[in-house]
């Protein structure tokens, strides 16, 4: 089972670029976005199971210097991916 997740990340002020670049180097991370609004960075990821997602968050993301908080949203269903509609 593949688990897709969107991770919402709060970063120490002035450190968004450093954190974004560090996250972009992680092979488990698919996309990294710097945002306006509530969160500083959002990343998308795909893991083989929830245990691997948990490990990614606790053992890698939370250890990146200047990451303050990670909030996770697990994708339940995808309606459109890469500009293609998905109907299952």
Go through each PLM region and give its residues:
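A compositional/biophysical signature of low hydrophobicity enriched in polar/charged and small residues
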Residues: 1-88
């Amino acid at each position: 089972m593949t688990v897709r997740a969107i991770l919402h990340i709060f970063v120490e002020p002035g450190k968004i670029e450093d954190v974004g670049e560090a996250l972009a180097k992680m092979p488990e991370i698919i996309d990294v976005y710097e945002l306006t609004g509530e969160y500083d960075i959002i990343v998308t990821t795909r893991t083989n199971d929830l245990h691997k997602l948990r490990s990614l968050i606790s053992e890698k993301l939370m250890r990146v210097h200047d990451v303050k908080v990670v909030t996770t949203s697990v994708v339940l269903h995808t309606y459109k991916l890469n500009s293609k509609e998905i109907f299952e």
